[in-house]
Amino acid sequence: MNIVPSKKLIDKLLYMEVDDNDFHQATLNIMYQEWQTNYIGYTYKEILDWFEDTYDSFAKFAVLIGKYNQQVCNGGHIQYFDNGYANGDGGCFYKHSSSIPLHNELIKLFEKTELKEDELSLKVLKILKKFEIEEEDDEILNYDYLRALDSEYYKLCNEFMELINDYIKHKIIGE
């Protein structure tokens, strides 16, 4: 069964009068604004759970894939891990679990979208599934592997983010 946006999310985005090219970023902004205004003490995982409970799994997927893209494009998969976005607890300088639970949830949600039928999306999904952290004594051991994974993603990320925004726009306004 595919995930779809809730009426509440659709209404919120339409009320915001979002520019056609910004549906994805607008979804991230909704969560970030709530986090900074009303839930400042929450961890990333806690605010994501609140966002999913308030809106839906579709909204959570939009945030997870957006933060993945932002973190990887800014500093690679190592930054994505080190800043806590693959794990959900704490931020930079915290100890994060190499079991990467939020990243695994991203993959599960991705597989519940129609994106799994698109060739470009399948390439990105393959990269997502290849992401893993090998560490010993808080040192990342698979640095070269992660840098190669970064390079793979960088070749696809701009086109993929356009696809994500178009996908979200289509789900919100049906165009």
Predicted regions mapped to residue ranges:
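Extended, alpha-helix-rich binding/interface surfaces that flank or overlap catalytic cores
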Residues: 2-104, 108-175
